[in-house]
A protein has these predicted regions:
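Short, flexible loop motifs at catalytic/binding sites
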Residues: 1-82
Length: 82
């Protein structure tokens, strides 16, 4: 199992543009909608990234996204997230 970068962004196109700028290949990153939460309810786009990073269910979120088969992660630096 290899690690992928989770890119938290307001839409897929924004995440894809940022990933291309970082020279990431498609298999190296996964888009995470800033509007998504574990319950599946809409949230403000102004997600508090620090709070999101500290959530113990962040790995569950990554594993349940349709765009991700499997994401293994311990912790993400703030600079890793759009």
């Amino acid at each position: 199992m290899h690690k992928r970068l989770l890119i938290l962004a307001r839409d897929f196109n924004t995440a894809q543009r940022w990933a291309k700028e970082q020279r990431l290949s498609p298999g190296q990153w996964v888009y995470v909608s800033a509007f998504y939460n574990i319950q599946g309810n809409a949230e403000s786009e102004y997600v508090l990234l620090d709070n999101w990073l500290e959530r113990p269910d962040a790995n569950i979120l990554a594993e349940t996204l349709e765009t991700s088969r499997c994401v293994e992660s311990e912790r993400f630096r703030r600079s890793d997230i759009l």
